[in-house]
Amino acid sequence: MQNNSLNLSLPEDFRGVHIHFVGIKGTGMAALVEILFHKGAVITGSDVSERFYTDEVLERLGLKALPFGAANITDDVQYVIYSSAYKLDKNPDLIEAVRRGLPCLIYTQ
């Protein structure tokens, strides 16, 4: 499976840009979500159902982690950022994002 992040440039202005996070409850991911949310990005994300302390961070922003599923990748999603805990060819969100040709960036990028 191809990673669609080669030669990717993110916008300088995140207002209205829809970014989906796979593994949104991770410590680093939640911090990035918070930054991009305050820059005006539209945020969705998926993760396991287990409760983590980062759920409180997400809830303060009015966000909730969705269960993994291809349906999370709607027509509005413009970028996908994912945790290294998930693989492009194994996670249903990522499989759908790649199928649609969306830019997929691993969190560390």
Regions found by a protein language model. Name each.
Residues M1-T108:
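N-terminal leader/targeting and accessory segments in enzymes
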